[in-house]
A protein has these predicted regions:
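Cyclophilin-like peptidyl-prolyl cis-trans isomerases
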Residues: 1-167
Length: 167
């Protein structure tokens, strides 16, 4: 089953395909957070040209590095779903940001270029279908010494697109 979400950002829309069957726990967490409006107002808080842009922190605190999940675990994090077939092999790969093994929450990133050094370390759960021009704009943003965009760019909202081929 293909599931599509559209990130409506302050720079334009990015349509994503989420790999529900390949990484069900990661997909369920992402989709549930989208449905609960968790990502609304979430800033793109880390940007490294030729690498990636990261988002998914709570909108209430733009400087927060916090993360949340739908899973009732002691640390509010969940395990990796590393799949050898899902790789960081192109621009527009959507993957979980983490702080090490089995430390996934709400934060994720979109690659600007292949990042094979992340294969086996970060869970790939989707890819960009449309909106590469928005990625182009994001990648050109000026950043500070800590790789934070100097201009505020955020996810305004997320919408679902039904798959007309689903049964």
């Amino acid at each position: 089953m293909l599931t599509r979400r559209q990130l409506h950002t302050s720079r334009g829309d990015i349509k994503l395909e989420v790999f529900c069957e390949s990484v069900p726990k990661t997909a369920e967490n992402f989709l549930a957070l989208c449905a609960s409006d968790y990502y609304n107002g979430s800033p793109f808080h880390r940007l490294i040209p030729n690498f990636m842009v990261q988002t998914g922190s709570p909108a209430s605190d733009p400087k927060s590095k916090a993360s949340a999940t739908i899973y009732d675990t002691p640390n509010q994090l969940f395990e990796d779903e590393i799949r050898p077939a899902l790789r960081h092999n192109s621009r527009g790969i959507v993957s979980m940001a983490n702080k090490g093994v089995n430390s996934n929450g709400s934060q994720f990133f979109i690659t600007f270029a292949p990042a094979p050094h992340l294969d086996g370390k970060n869970t790939v759960f989707g890819k960009v279908l449309e909106g590469t021009e928005v990625l182009d704009e994001l990648e050109k943003l000026e950043v500070d010494k800590k790789s934070r965009p100097k201009e505020k760019v955020e996810i305004k909202s997320v919408t679902m697109h039904a798959n007309p081929l689903a049964g």
